[in-house]
Each structure stands twice: as C-alpha cells, then as structure tokens.
C-alpha cells in the first residue's frame, strides 16, 4: 500500500514542502529564519484576531478599547504585548533573513528574491498601519507625517494624501480604513509567502558554500524540522522574556497619551524597525528627494542581483566583501540610532554620512570589491 502522504493531493504538497523536501546537508542556523518568519506571521494573525474582537476603530473609543483589552479582557495584556513585541521579533527575523540572502548570494534566485522584496514592503506597510491603531500621540503624528510624505509626488501629491486620509487630516475615516487594511494585509502576506516558498522549491535552497548541492541532499524531516523547532523555542523564549519582563522596552512612551491633533510631540519617530529608513529620509533636505531615498533604501535590494560581479556566489571565501558586509551592518545600526535622535548637530551630519555610505557600499564598493577578488584569484 502506498503512503497516503505521498498520494493524497493535499498531503502531497505538504509532504514535498516540509517532509521529503531534499535539503542541502550543510545549511547553518542562518537558514532557520524562513520558518521563524512563518511562525511569527501565524502568531501575529492569531493574536491580531483576538485583539480585533475587542478593538473599536473609532477615534473616540480606539484608545480606551486598547486600555480595556489590557485591563478587563482575560489575558488581554498578554495578547496585546505578544502582538506588539511579536512585530519586533518579526522584523528582527526579517532583517536577519535578508542579511543572510545578501551574504550568501541567495539573491541569484531572482523570482524568490523579488517576491521577498514585495513581502518586505507589504510587512512594512502592515506594521505602519498597525502602529496607528492604538490612537496614541505617536500613532496619530506618525500617521500624519508618513502619509504626508506622499504630497511630495508632483501634481497628484496633495489629492492623493487627502484621498488616503478620507478628509483634510488624519481622522476617523483614516483610522477605520487603516484597521481594514491592517486586518486584510497579513492574509495577503500569507499568500505571498506561499508563492515565495513555491519559487524557492523550484530551485532548491542555497547553502553556505554557494556550490550546487544536488549531490549531497538530505530529507527535511527529521533533520531540519528538529532544527527549526529549536529555533522556534529560542524565538518563543526571547519573545516571552520581552512580553513578561519589559513589554514596553521597544515601544514609545508617547503612545500612552491619547492622540491630540493640537499638541505635537517633541520628537516624532516611528517604531525602531523603521528608524534606519527614517534616518535616510531625514538626511536629505529636499522633501521629494527624501521620499525617493526612503523608497530606494529598500528598493535597492532589487538592483543587487544585477550588480553581482563575483565569480563566487556567497561571501564565505571573499574576505574583502565580508568586511564591506559587516561595515554595512554597522552602518545600518548607526542609521537606526540616528533615526531615534533629534534633528540637530552632530546627528544631522552623522545621518547624512551614514546614508551616503549605505548606498555607496551596496552600489559601488561591493561590486568593485568583487572584481578585485576575482583578479586576486588569478594570482
């Protein structure tokens, strides 16, 4: 009798994706983040669903409904903080996942990479809209500042912003539509993630050496299922430490003040995971230029496969590129720090230098270093 998991139409898909999937035998813990992102997404959808049962998307009651969730709903505070800090864990995993792709040359799988970029944009949009929902001071002013950036688009900008707002300012209509979008987008992300996986399984996984591993594959289960469970347990440990010991560590105290259109907070800043892009935006004195730089800070990832000049795939055996990669990581950490600082000397200059360095490393230094390494191999 044939095994049902290999013959049943639905079980067969699951089997070929998670059980009998031929996987390179040498992939490291850096390959855990795909499954961790899947776990984060499911966690966010579930906690978000329970929050949506008690939340009201009305400017008059949104803030108090979140307070009600934390005070009166059974374990509401756990659900709320798991959702808020779950978003932070999601972005940590995302950044590490993208970093892994850059380091090991996974971007040569262009379909998988491009779907990944679309996923990154979608997750960022979802997180931004979710941040608006508690209707605190930073929610309101964050929404006002970020949506207002669209007014930099020539000719249609102002009309576009008012169309998104549903009026002449961020108000009830804006909050209601942001809630609707915030609810639907995770399911779109789920569909995109399935497509991401579909394209990945067309080519098979990359591995640390960057050398094709068709001659040395092992089944995904039990080897990598157990490895992924270990990663998931570590993720759960970090998340629950955050939720139970310092739930507001990554949040903004201003968001515990109800939204007030008449009172601007001293420093308007987004959640920590957007600070690097926010710093790039602020480092350009021109509004349209800043918006373009902001979009390009993520969209630059789409150009990277075209700039791959090395004869090797990953950076495992390329010391010059490795140095540049870790310089890029340090630069992004610097940008994240600058994004949270007020716009004054010396932060302005540091931000501008870090922004220039970010684009220079990705677009100039890395391709040049690869050419140098190719020539060094000839010696």
UniProtKB/Swiss-Prot annotation:
GO biological process: one example: mitochondrial electron transport, ubiquinol to cytochrome c
Cofactor annotation comment: Binds 2 heme b groups non-covalently.
One cellular component term from this protein's GO annotations in UniProt: respiratory chain complex III
Metal-binding as UniProt keyword: yes
SUPFAM superfamilies: a domain/subunit of cytochrome bc1 complex (Ubiquinol-cytochrome c reductase), Transmembrane di-heme cytochromes
Binding annotation for heme b b566: 97, 196
GO molecular function, one term: metal ion binding
CDD domains registered for this protein in UniProt: cytochrome_b_C (cd00290), Cytochrome_b_N (cd00284)
InterPro entries named among the record's database cross-references: Cyt_b/b6_C (IPR005798), Cyt_b/b6_C_sf (IPR036150), Cyt_b/b6_N (IPR005797), Cytb/b6-like_sf (IPR027387), Cytochrome_b (IPR030689), Cytochrome_b_C_euk/bac (IPR048260), Cytochrome_b_N_euk/bac (IPR048259), Di-haem_cyt_TM (IPR016174)
Residues engaged in binding heme b b562: 83, 182
Quaternary structure, from the entry: The cytochrome bc1 complex contains 11 subunits: 3 respiratory subunits (MT-CYB, CYC1 and UQCRFS1), 2 core proteins (UQCRC1 and UQCRC2) and 6 low-molecular weight proteins (UQCRH/QCR6, UQCRB/QCR7, UQCRQ/QCR8, UQCR10/QCR9, UQCR11/QCR10 and a cleavage product of UQCRFS1). This cytochrome bc1 complex then forms a dimer.
Designated name of the protein: Cytochrome b
